[in-house]
Each structure stands twice: as structure tokens, then as C-alpha cells.
Swiss-Prot record:
This is Queuine tRNA-ribosyltransferase catalytic subunit. One of its GO terms (biological process) is tRNA-guanine transglycosylation. Zn(2+) binds at residues 301, 303, 306, 331. The active site is at 89 (proton acceptor), 262 (nucleophile). Its EC number is 2.4.2.64. It comes from Caenorhabditis briggsae. Its cofactor is Zn(2+). Heterodimer of a catalytic subunit and an accessory subunit. Gene3D superfamilies: Queuine tRNA-ribosyltransferase-like.
Amino acid sequence: MKYDVLARAGFARRGNLHLPHSIVETPVFMPVGTQGTMKGVVTEQLVAMDCRILLCNTYHLGHRPGHERVKAAGGIHKMMNWNRSILTDSGGFQMVSLSKLMTVDENGVNFESPHTGEMMALPPEKSIEIQQALGADIMMQLDHVIHVLTTGDIVKEAMHRSIRWLDRCKVAHTRDDQAMFPILQGGLNLDLRKECAEEMAKRAKVGIAIGGLSGGEEKDHFWRVVAACCAALPPHLPRYVMGVGFPVDLVICSFLGADMFDCVYPTRTARFGTAMVRRGGLMQLNQKRYKEDFLPIDDKCKCNTCKNYTRAYIHSIAGKETVACHLVSIHNIKHQLDLMRDVRQAIQSNSVEKFLRQFLFDYYGPIQSENPSKQDTEKVQEVPQWVRDAVDHMGYTLDF
């Protein structure tokens, strides 16, 4: 794996990540196919959107269908008919999401399967064994993940344990064709984050992840941790902020210096009939206001949904037919990929401030209406203070 920085603008970088299955342009959003499948989307559709990399979940694939079966099928790429890049997480996040089903000690994590009730031991070495069998382009170390709002000695303990587990993962990592990222921990404590960044940087060869965020912390804490971590990490390695998927978060983190992101948000929110749009942020298509709205979700979007279907049609089937989830998922994933394309272009052309002003004005403004005169009278929402503070930290100003 090789990472080339092609352009810089402020803290932000535009780069190319050279992986065995594709060249990934950064900053990049990675859709999540938890068990080797995207909710409501097939791989051919992802290729049509020019998605270059996606994420699969080691814990869930290890349980079902099992990493031995995936390996027997020729690896995760062949099994899911995907010839582009894949990143697998380590299973560490399930320490939070499945906290009632697990225990953790120095040896590793012990999970109870939510599917069968069977116990599964996951030491760092086993996490790497599973990920090597899956065959992803990028693997993650097993880290000790705690809830982001946790306080006390456990925060420091989990951070140091993550460093020790990284050393064990490095010994277990034997495949040269798979990159492995350390994961930076430390909660909301900036001093611990910087200490962890220093230790992880000594051990990192190809990239570093920033973990333990997007778990309900205040946004003011969120962006400051991302900014501090990016500033403390080596400039030649890609920085991956795990679990980030809200459009504003993607934009802000990219311009703070982060390069990679993942989240289930585009497909999860689609299940509730919620579409992501540049003008107005979120569109709740199950609301009655869209009953006779014959515009596409976004008239500037080139996804198959926006080319062929109206808001009124999706409203009529939202919550009733699975195809509604499929159509909105297609749009939401394309929205995120296009947003990151525009972020890269802003960095390349050194027009970040101009992009920020337009993006935030549109995002916190009104949703596009069939009645332009009514839309013109609506006022933009207040941009959150945390966003303004982050933009100010970058050295840019908003003119509204």
C-alpha cells in the first residue's frame, strides 16, 4: 500500500491511496457492508457510482458465515463479487455496541454470539487471523474500545491496552498484501490522545485510525479531538476517523486533515424514508408534504433514483415496500460519494473557504421546493456554534 498526497489546502489533503484492488482517492467515504452485503444495494450498483472501497465487519463475518467459509469461497472479494478495495474493522467496536454480551481482559474479548448464543474468544491474534482469512486490502488492529463518555482510570487503561494489543497484532500480521492500521484511543482527553498518537506513530507503517468517537459526545468535543489527533499524526500517512457519516461531519473532518471515513448512516436512515440532500440536509419522504411532490429527491443528483423516480412515488411506498429503502439507499450512498468528490475538488483547487460557505448555506437552508417564490422567503437555519468554531480553527470565515 502506498499513499500519495497530491494537494494541500490548510489542514486538508487530497491524495491517492494505492491498494491491491483499486486506487482510492481521498478524502473518501466508505459505505458499510456489515456481513459482506450492502443493505438494499448490490455491488454492480456500487461500481456504477464509482465506489472504490467499502467496509465489512470482522466480528459479524467471523460469526456468520464464518471466516473459514469465506476463505474457502476465495476470500471476501470473490464471495461478494467485488473487485475493488475492502477495509475490515477488527471487532473492537462491538465492545460498545454489544457490551451486554461481552467481557474484556488483557488476553482479549469474549463475546456471546447474538445469533447462536455461542461464546467466541477474540484475542488480538484471532482478530488478525480472521481478517487475513477474509482477505481485505486494509485490516484494523484489535483495540480496547470504551464508550466515548466514559471517564476515570479506565480511559487511560484502555488506551495503553490498545497499544499493547497493537504489538501483538503486528506479530500476528503475516500477509504483505494486506495493510494494517493502528487505532488511536484516549477518549475525550486530548493529552491521552496525543500520547497515544505518539506511540501509534512509532508503530504505524501505512496509516492510522482515530477510534472511539461518534458515540454521543458533544460535537464541540468531537471536532476538537479530531483536530488534535490529525495535528499529532505523521503527515505522510492517511488518517481514518472511524464511524463518521453525517455530511457536515465529513466536510468538517476532511478540512481538519482527516482522509477516510465510514458509517452505516446512509443505508440505515434510508430504511426510515430519509434522504440526504445538499439543500436542507435531510428529507423525510414519509411526510405528507411530499404526497404530490413530483420533483426528484435532488435535481442535481445523477443517481438512478433521482433520474427515474419522484419524491411522490417514494412517499407512496415508504414504509410499505422494500424497494423504497433500496431507492433511497442508492441515492444516499451516491450523495456521500459525490460530496467527497466535491471536497477533493475544493482541496485540489484551493477553494475550501468558498466551498464551506456554499455547502453550509445550502445545508442549513430550505429544502428545494416546487414553489421557488416560497423557498426564497425562507431563511437559512442557524449554523451550529461547533461548526463555526471548527471553521474558525481552520482559519476560514463564513459570510452569513
